[in-house]
């Protein structure tokens, strides 16, 4: 093997030392002597030379002509500027005596500075002209600026003039009579005012001054009649007392009652009113239209007392008719006298004018204070009774809770068949009791924010989806970390008693060692 390697000849043969030289081959145009003299040739074709990139409007050739800067002569300083030398005897101050401080104050106050075309056009002070400074003005002589246009004022004046002409034609005779005898009228007025009280005299004097003004302007007031009223103090007092007496009579109008001697007067007023059922303390009793009667609110004196309850037949006769006032027809009524407890304000009955025949009886263990209920004489025997306690029991069974047993809820109501046939069946609104609001407060903050809502007439359930319409299958999203987005309106069943395994504490994170072992850690 060594012999074979030694026998091989080298492939490259080098000439001897004196003949050894370096040779480079160039093209004629790429020779070192001609590289910089000729431009380089590119393979892509040559394009047209682009002109200068000028904005529109500057394409003219005159912009390309530039002045020769070398031809402009340079100005040489004849003498250098004097050197600034600081003198130690100078005193530096704040500049209070300078004439520029006023101009500086104007600049500080942001007075606008204008550029004037010539020195002669510059005023002494741009904010105030010298002509205004030289003159002395009196502000009291300044005319007032009109708030309304002249056109509107002319229209209003024309309307007032037309109205005054019409009124002057109507009251010309009355004004003439007053002008002929102004002294006697004023004397009568003064003499009439002397007998009045100080307040009445002041009011009368104010009316007289207004009357004298209206006499000049013209009005439709009968001045003679007004003067006659004001000059008579007795007439003024009678007018005041009559108005106060009428108002007091209309407010407190008693009703004469003929009740058996076995019973004593009643302390608590009760009114049977069909037109105003929303009265507060006197409970409204609805009476059929056949026996409807208006009873005054001040039926009895509240200071009277009542004996133990006894059913007594009595009759109420309204007061005798007064001249100029309507009267009502007397009507027999039944009295059921009892002692009632002090109870809170009852809920108002929704139906205001239902033709019902009500017969109120005393429930056991309810009364502790005297109370009178007025009812008309029933014509027919009641065939069916509708108790509000049963209605409350139905409300509690459907989830609305038992309402407060006060007012109308604490008394049974008897509906006669004649009234039921003659009129439509009364619709009773379900009343929400105290338990309903307690449950609502207790459920606040949970997932169930909806309430049980029932239709007022048909009783259709308008709340959540009924369980009968739901698919009997557990919701896969309920109880998870994200939860069900549908909430109570979900068509699947949400089992609230199912154990929630996702809500448990998170487990410890498991370490993965395979990746570290492969990397050699």
Curated annotation (Swiss-Prot):
A zinc finger (C3H1-type) spans 469-497. It comes from the Eukaryota. Transmembrane segments: none annotated. Residues 28-60, 142-185, 296-319 are annotated as: Disordered. Keywords: DNA-binding, Metal-binding, Zinc, Zinc-finger. The keyword Zinc applies. Residues 159-168 have a biased composition (Low complexity). This is Zinc finger CCCH domain-containing protein 45. It comes from Arabidopsis thaliana (Mouse-ear cress).
